[in-house]
Amino acid sequence: MELKLLLLSLGFLFISCSSCMPGDNNGEENGSENGSNTDPGDSETEFEYEWDKFPVPVSAGTGMKWELQSQSDDFNYTADSNNKGNFEKKWTDYYHANWSGPAPTIWQRDHISVSDGCLRIETSRPDDVKIVKVTSGDKEKMMPGTYTGCVTSKTRVVYPVYVEAYAKIANSTMASDVWMLSPDDTQEIDIIEAYGSDRVVGDDGHKFYGPDRIHLSHHVFIRDPFQDYQPTDPGSWYKDVNGTIWRNDFHRVGVYWKDPFNLEYYVDGKMVRRVSGKNIIDPNDFTKGTGLSKEMDIIINMEDQSWRAISG
């Protein structure tokens, strides 16, 4: 997976997350942060940041403006997998806790690098790979681990904020992910969760969503005893009218976390999903009436998810 990241906050916070190509933008409603109204199609225009060429798709509202946040990163620098330099000013090359990922995933720090204007997450399975136990429901299987990467922001974000990634998902059965998670792992907002492979049926007959879908969702959890809520309506698996195969190019995918009970999702500058109110944000009252209210880390990773791996 390759990506860039943009973060804006209202009056505010805004993150731009992008990948290995020109990507995100930031600014006020009609232009860049300083209020200019540049033409994205004008090749003569010079931009301070790659995301300046795109208007922010969300109105800041009367008397408000979007402010670019320092966690935003267009990845226009080089960071070797074993010597990350500038990358470490904003990111940690691992998960936000001491966890190596959902088996058979094993996150490795040296599978993260930055080059050619993109954050790059690689995947490998060497001959001497560790064998791990994978469990999904009542199924259990021993299988080779999958080495890949995960990064976590050093700055947390909270509403009102617009976070946008300019990303190209991997051609893989693995998940390409951009998401936000509270430090206690009880509140989560998924910006991108997508599977780029054409393989949509497992060896056990389990059917998967394919490369024409992007999962736009959120979770609230109780950790003990474990309970997990997320919306299951068809709109959470976005498919556009053209049947776009999302792995074929870079796309901008963002979420406007307006407040604890309102989320808006944007794809290539167009709002494609809105979830609003307790009945869809937290119908089981796991948050005790507070909704999605906690500060969150931004996490970018790939995962060989247990349920999919065990299906074969």
Question: Where do the protein language model's features map onto the residues?
Answer:
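Positively charged n-region of N-terminal signal peptides that target proteins for export
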Residues: 1-5
